C-alpha cells in the first residue's frame, strides 16, 4: 500500500478557504476511485493557514490512475495556486 501525506500552507486566509474547498471536493470525488483505501482532509487545529490531505492507495497503479483523472488535475491546480504543497510518500 502507498500512503501520501500532503501538507498545504496557504499564502492568505482567503486562499486557504479556496484551497480547502478544492481539497474537500477532491476527497469526495476520490472516495469512488478504484484502489482508494482512505482519502481525508484535516485542517490544522493550531495554524489557520494549514491543512493536510492523507491518502492511502492499494497500489501504484491505482494511484497513477487517480492522478491522471481530470478532476485531480483541475483541483490540484487550484490548491497549488493558493499556496505551497509538500508531499511525503510511504510504502507499507
Where do the PLM segments sit?
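Short S/T/G/P-rich N-terminal loop/turn motif that feeds into the first structured element of a domain
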Residues: 1-51, 56-68, 86-92
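Outer-membrane beta-barrel domain signature
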Residues: 72-81
Amino acid at each position: 500500500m502507498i500512503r501520501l501525506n500532503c501538507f498545504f500552507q496557504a499564502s492568505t486566509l482567503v486562499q486557504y478557504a479556496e484551497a480547502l474547498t478544492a481539497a474537500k471536493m477532491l476527497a469526495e470525488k476520490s472516495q469512488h476511485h478504484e484502489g482508494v483505501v482512505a482519502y481525508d482532509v484535516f485542517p490544522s487545529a493550531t495554524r489557520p493557514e494549514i491543512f493536510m490531505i492523507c491518502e492511502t492507495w492499494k497500489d501504484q497503479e491505482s494511484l497513477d490512475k487517480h492522478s491522471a483523472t481530470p478532476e485531480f488535475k483541475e483541483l490540484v491546480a487550484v490548491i497549488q495556486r493558493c499556496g505551497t504543497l509538500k508531499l511525503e510518500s510511504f510504502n507499507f
